[in-house]
Structure formats: structure tokens, C-alpha cells
Amino acid sequence: MKKFKLLLLALMCVAFLPSKADEGMWLLQLMQEQHLADRMKAQGLLLEADDIYNPNRVSLKDAVGIFGGGCTGEIISPDGLILTNHHCGYGAIQQHSSVEHDYLTDGFWAKSRKEELPTPGLKFKFVERIVDVTDKVNNKVKSGEVKEEETFEYDFLKKLADEELKASDLNGKAGISAQALPFYAGNKFYLIYLKTYSDVRMVAAPPSSIGKFGGETDNWMWPRHTCDFSVFRIYADANGEPAEYNENNVPLKAKKHLAISLKGINEGDYAMIMGFPGSTNRYLTQSEVKQRMHSTNEPRIRIRGVRQDVLKKEMAASDKVRIQYASKYAGSSNYWKNSIGMNKAIIDNKVLETKAEQEAKFAAFAKAKGNTDYEKVVSEIDAAIEKSNPILYNYTCFREVFQGGIEFGTPYLILDKLKDAIKNKDKEAINKNIETLKKVYADIHNKDYDHEVDRKVAKALLPLYAEMVPADALPAFYTTIQKDFKGNYDAYVDHCYDNSIFSNEANFNKFIKKPTVKAIEKDPMTAYVRAKYDLMDKLGNELAESMKGMDLLHKTYVRGLCEMYSPEPKAPDANFTIRLTYGNVKSYNPKDGVHYKYYTTLKGVMEKEDPTNPEFVVPAKLKELYEAKDFGRYALPNGDMPACFLTTNDITGGNSGSPVINGNGELIGAAFDGNWESLSGDINFDNNLQRCIAVDIRYVLFIIDKLGGCKHLIDEMTIVE
């Protein structure tokens, strides 16, 4: 407990240093203790801390939530209208798209609420309450109820959350759930209550030529001209409570929505972002950074690059395949390019040298303090990393090929149950398992899967995997490839993809009419899947064993670093919980002789136009609006149409769609990307280079109003001019 009290002092105390671009994805619940509002006001904030986060009344926090499974969205009207990124809504847009109704290409604009499209599976979550449960966790450790290392485990955290929810006044209320999570590497724990709405409908989305303008080429780059937005709406029951889709549901009367500023932005203006950053690793050692580069990023880059080449070719040849694989390709290429940029930025920004300097400083601090745990922790981390490096490399290769690459497979565990039922002549069990298999077949051959495309992916990835890993990291079916197919990967893949029970409807229907043990045992894809999962278990167990004790080592190291840097407060790593980052609108100089100003305009879209490149096609209607200078009240004072802008805010994946808010608490943009030069930012923040790329809210409203013809949406927003 003494160690924890020292950490609290390190986290809560603040040295009032000169204002600067601020590193940190800050916890809202620690704003008062860390005196963040004082620093924010020094940079231009005109609100009080209570206006941003107040557990006892409505605040800005109540206008921000989790959109889908990994993005942020904000409420922009009293009637539950959500603004998020186009790439966040991309899966939903694709879900509603077909060759006949190609909303990816053409965009979608609901002209009335009756036209808003229900989107099964899409959810929006608000943070209802945040509770510090650190003392409860520490007391459980102290009493022997749980071991310290177990406090990081899912089972413990789930049980704790369930216990706390059951004892809470929120228990039993519609849509309420709770999650317990470690912060500061397990030196603090918070319980977060969420309220989930599951009737979320698609309202508006620009064509991909606007919402994804620049495509893969411009991803992570500046200057940027992407109008990366989409609009949805939350529906609830008559009492405003969460409910599954029902035609009688009504738009949510939001507790809080963001006013929208058309007043514009200037260099140096205050800007803050509230959202749900997914993951950062700012407290890594030098050896851990090297591991990220070589055991994770490098194999990901190589394997995804090969798969994406296959998908790109197939998508270009078929509109059906393009729509089916649009979301998968975008998700894959996003972190493929991120990994390339991260490795480059680690070298260019001398992150390894920075980490080495930090470790030397920490060693001196530990020695002066006489803390033996601190003195040995880095060397203990390094030893574990050295042991785990080859295992993590193999595991990354496995996951990229067999979990994120090749999709086709069979449910071997269900087939095993069916086989037992057939042997036992248990008709009830046979019928039950066949009904389950019917659902699985439909899941495999879903509308976003093409068997022939996946076959080509498998033919590309299986030999690549064999080339990249040692023999002991190969699934058993590689022996079959060598022995029965003389090393011919294409022939093996064709055998599996043609002759499995699950290959096609004809094979499947033939099997379920007369299921036999022999057919199950001879199924080539089932043998493939069984071998795949056997290897996954082996690699997973090896990796877990090699990293044993690492959580506690990190806990010690982070505690020590916070003490070393005290009284300067430190923010915990991101873990997809609500955070605040503050800074300013700011240009930057990426290299000698190059200056990037803080904003772009629609003129740049026209300059980038290339009708022969699908990433840089400009819709005819947008060109007409540009040539007519029909920008209305959304234009800059000089008549130009603003597009995107830069801030010094500290963001990462998960922040996509987050509101960029000015000093008055008004919406000025939506964050959607980071810049290429700072892709090492998840590991080491660089004040000079780190930039958030946001779409200007005026560009968003211009597209909704003038191109989409949805003035009725503008009318329900609160506009400040």
C-alpha cells in the first residue's frame, strides 16, 4: 500500500510548467486532481472542468460515445443524430450496399426519418459512470482472495465488474453494463458503466470518392482533403431507453449534444478532443520497441501486403467482390500502412535512442532511491523479451495468415459431436447438430465472402507462411502438402476448397441428407482446421509461458517512471476508455525546407483529381459546386472552401470520429487520422511532429447541405455563427 500511495502522489501532483503542446490521453475523472483545467485554460479553454466532466450533472462527456466496435461518435442534435467518420461507418454502408444500391460509390442521403436505414448489429455506447475501485482490488490482493498477477486477467476483472454492477443502483436498468479495467499498468483500477443503444440507423454518407478521397495513397498523410464523415441516428423506446429495433422506436432525446461552430479556426486556436483511443504503449522499454518492430510489424507488413495484392486485383475485376471486400480491405490496409510508417518513424525520430536515455535516467533514479525492484526491472523485462521474440514472431505470422488472412474453415468441434451422435445412433443429437451446421454454413458463405477469392488468398499465403517460419511452427497439414501433393500448394488448396463438406451448397446438402462418419473423417478442410487450431494452442501457450510475470514487471516499471517524473503528471496508456486530449491548431515542419500549413481547402481536391485513379476521382456534382463557388455560409472569409486541418492533439486508433472542440465547447471538426511523420507516436510522443488530422465541420455541413441536399439535417443542429 505504501508503494501505491507514492504512485498517487506522482499521478496527482502537478508542476505548473509553461504551456506547450500537450502529450497525454487524460482520464476525465482525474481532471481536478491533476489540475488539467488550469493548463487547458492557459492554452485557450473558456469552460470550467465541470462543463467537460461532471459525475453529478450533464456535461460534454454525455455527447460522446463509442460508435460500433472501435470508433468514437458524437451527438450533434437534440434528436440523437450521430457524427462519426466515413471509415467508421464504412462497414454499415457496405452492409446496406449491393450492386443495385451501391451506397459505397453513390453515397446515401435519407431525405426523411422514414428513409433512415436500420443497421442490425450496430451499437452506440455512452459512459454513464466511472468509479475508482483500486482500493477494492488491493484489498482483495491483501486478503489473499486473489493473487496480484491475477488482477490483470479477464476472469477476475469480469467477476469484479459483475459484483459491482449487481450492488449498484444501475443494476437491471436497460442497456447498462459494466467493465473493470487496469490503468497505469495495474497501479489503478476503474469500473466503467456503459449504456448501450442497439437501434442505430444510417442517415447520411457521402460517396467514397468524397468520404475516402485519397484512399490508401493519402492514408496517414498530410496535406489531406478527405471529407471523412458519416451520419447515423440513435433510436430508443418511448421512454428514451435502449431497445432492439422496432418500427415504433423514436429518435433519442439526447441528454447533451454539441453545438457546431461556423466561426472558423486560426493558427494557435485551442482545440481538445474527447474520445476512445484504443491502445498506446508509451511505457515500453527499448527492447520492447525493437520487438514491436521486428516480431509484430515486419511480419504483418509482409503478409498483409501479399493478401491485399490478391484482394485488390479481384476487387478491380468485379463490382460484387469490390463491395464484399471493401471493409475488409480497408481495415487490413490501414494497419499495414501504419506498421510501415511506425517502423520508419521509430528510426527517423530516434525513438530507440530516447528509450535508452530514459532507461539510463531510470537506472540512476533507482540506484539513488535504493529500490532494488526498480534497479532490476528493466533487465528482467529485457530477458523476457529476448525469450519471447521468436515465439511472438511465429504467433504474429500465424495470426496474420490463418486468422486474419484465410477465411474458409469448418466447425470441427460440431462435426466431432455429430460423429459421436452418428456412432451412437442418437437421432435427436444428429438432427440438433445438423441444424447447427446449417447456421454455420450460412455464416461461412455470408454475403461478404467469395469462395474463389478466398481460394486465391490461400494459394498466396500458404507458401509464404512456410517461407517465413521455422519447421516447428508449421501446422501438421504442411506434411500432407509435401507427402500427398508433392509440395504443390495450389493442388492442396483446390483439394480442400473443392472437396470439403462446406465447399459449396451441393456438397453440403448431399452430406446433411445422409451424414456419415466416413465423410467427416475424410473432409480435407476439417483436417486443415484441426491442425491449425492445434498449432494455435501450442504457440499461444508458448507465448504465455515466455511472457509470464510481465504484467507485474510493467506495473513496477510504470510506477517507478511516474515517481521519477513526479510532480509532472503522466497519463496512462490508452485502453479504449474515454479520454481527453488538449492542444492547439498548428502547422508543422516535417523536414528541412518543408512547411505544412494547418489547413487545406477544396482547391486541393481539384488539384489532386485523377479520373484514371479510383482513389482520386472527383464527383461531377462536387466539381459543379466548386466551379460555381456555391459554398454558402461554410466558406472562408476569402471565399475558399475549407477541407481539413491540423491540431497538436494526442490521438490514436479508436479516436476516429472523435469531436474536435474549441475553447467554447463547440464542434469544429472530426478527427480521422494522424500524420506519417509521427506514426511512432503510440510509443513515443513528439511535440514537434505529432499532429491530429481532422475534417473541418464546415466541409462536412457543406457536403450534407449542398451535395446531399439534406438541409433538414442542418436545421436540427445547433449552429453558432
Swiss-Prot record:
Listed GO MF terms: dipeptidyl-peptidase activity; serine-type aminopeptidase activity
Q: Where is the site described as Critical for substrate specificity of DPP7 found in this chain? A: 674
Gene3D superfamilies with a match to the protein in the record:
Trypsin-like serine proteases
Q: What's its EC?
A: 3.4.14.-
Q: Which organism is it from?
A: Phocaeicola vulgatus (strain ATCC 8482 / DSM 1447 / JCM 5826 / CCUG 4940 / NBRC 14291 / NCTC 11154)
What enzyme category does the UniProt record give? hydrolase
Question: Which residues of this protein are catalytic?
Answer: 87 (charge relay system), 228 (charge relay system), 656 (charge relay system)
This chain is encoded by the gene named dpp7
From the UniProt record, give one GO term of the biological process aspect: peptide catabolic process
Q: Return the protein name.
A: Dipeptidyl-peptidase 7
Q: What does this protein do?
A: Catalyzes the removal of dipeptides from the N-terminus of oligopeptides. Most potently cleaves the synthetic substrate Met-Leu-methylcoumaryl-7-amide (Met-Leu-MCA), followed by Leu-Arg-MCA, while this enzyme does not hydrolyze Gly-Arg-, Gly-Gly-, Lys-Lys-, or Gly-Pro-MCA.
Could you say which residues form the signal peptide? Answer: 1-21
Enumerate the UniProt keywords alphabetically: Aminopeptidase, Hydrolase, Protease, Serine protease, Signal
- Highest rank taxon of the organism: Bacteria
Describe the family membership recorded for this protein in Swiss-Prot or TrEMBL: Belongs to the peptidase S46 family.
